[in-house]
Amino acid sequence: MKLFKYITIAFSSLFMCGCSDYLDNAPDDTLTMEMVFNDRTRTEDWLSGVYNRIPDNYWDLLKVWGYDSMGDDLDPSQRWYQWWGNSLNFIIGQWFTSSTWDAAIWSANPIRIRSAYLFIENAHALPDQGVSEANIERMKDECRFLIAYYYWQMIEAYGSVPFFDGLADVNDPNLMRGQMPFDEMVDWIDAQLVDLSKKLPASYLNESTQFYGRATSIMCLAVRARMLLFAASPLVNGNEWYAGFKNYDGKFRFSQTYDPAKWKRAADANRELIEA
């Protein structure tokens, strides 16, 4: 009987030790920034998450709620009404101030941008895990590209947008700010892409396949060329429809006069892309 008690106590002790070890493990949803960026796999996962949030232009701009569909014939017929009803209503003029819309890029891209800024601020070299300072700098440059790209998507869709050149502080009294003028946004994105086109590799052909699809200097030049062409177009280059559109500080959100020099700037950017 005593032997049975001793065996029971011994097994109970082992079981409790095992439970203690299991319960002491912190779940993933309580990870801190320090825990994430002190680990190579989690650091790389964070960067992948910034990439993974790249939206699909078709579904975020044109889809069921997309106002682009009002001027686009690339839309299903009446037989598709049960799936594309809202877009069809927009096309035939059945839309009102109360019509629904999808915030899509407006609400999601600032989250994507903040995620990239968090990486830039917190990521650091992990030499004991095979992550050099050069590796980290390239990954941060990739985040800078994604920030520029996400902002480009926003101004393409909405024109003038709120802008943060870094992490937004929730205690900042200027957190709720007006929209930065369209041309100023273009200039900022342009400067970022020009700088990054000199830092990022042109391709990853000699790298592991895990780098396929990552930001390159060619991507920088391509986004820049497309953006500057858009910025030169009559839609945002002296469009009289935007006359008088101002922020609370009195700044015009869009250029009030047509500037033909923007076409030259766009042409030069596209030539640079072609010759790259």
Residue ranges and their predicted role:
Residues 19-72, 118, 183:
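Acidic, glycine-rich segments characteristic of secretory precursors and extracytoplasmic regions
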Residues 147, 151-156, 160-167, 210-222:
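Aromatic-lined, polymer-binding surfaces characteristic
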Residues 1-28:
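Bacterial Sec-dependent N-terminal signal peptides
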Residues 153-157, 162, 204, 230-239:
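Short coil/turn linking the two alpha-helices of tandem helical-hairpin repeats
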Residues 230-232, 259-276:
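Polar, glycine-rich mid-to-C-terminal structural blocks
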Residues 160-179, 235-265:
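Short coil/linker segments at helix-helix boundaries
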Residues 26-32, 90-100, 249-250:
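Acidic/histidine-rich, surface-exposed loop or edge segments in extracytoplasmic proteins
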Residues 44-58, 80-158, 173-209:
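Conserved, well-structured interaction surfaces
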